[in-house]
Regions:
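Asp-based, Mg2+/Mn2+-dependent phosphohydrolase catalytic module
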Residues: 3-118
Length: 118
């Protein structure tokens, strides 16, 4: 899935943890990596999402943020003015008020299939 996505769009890894995409062997797929530990703000703070958009070289309104945490990822991205894909592997209901994410998928493969279709 990462190979499909990285071939088409600049991917930015955005993490509240200290994981390094290069250390885990995924760095080649990412245009940039932003860690809350390094920048001093964490999801769902809109500032970390703004840094991700800046790293990708696009306005927040043109970003499609994909994440598996409904509150930190999906709600955070939407509050930052981005489109959100909620990676909902558990199939739970959206309970975070307001608008729901642009798209909800059960897997990255499902996301890639949807993007490929159009």
């Amino acid at each position: 899935a990462l190979e499909f996505l990285a071939a088409r769009w600049p991917l930015v890894a955005l993490s509240n943890g200290t994981a390094d995409v290069n250390v885990v062997g995924l760095g080649r797929f990412f245009h940039a990596s932003i860690s809350a530990h390094r920048v001093g703000v964490a999801k769902p703070d809109p500032r970390i999402f703004a840094l991700a958009a800046e790293a990708a070289g696009v306005p927040a309104a043109n970003v499609l943020h994909v994440g598996d945490d409904a509150l930190l990822d999906a709600r955070g991205a939407m509050d930052a003015g981005m489109h959100a894909v909620w990676l909902n592997r558990a199939g739970v209901d959206w309970t975070h008020g307001g608008a729901s994410p642009s798209v909800t998928v059960a897997s990255l493969a499902q996301l890639c299939q949807g993007l490929a279709e159009g």
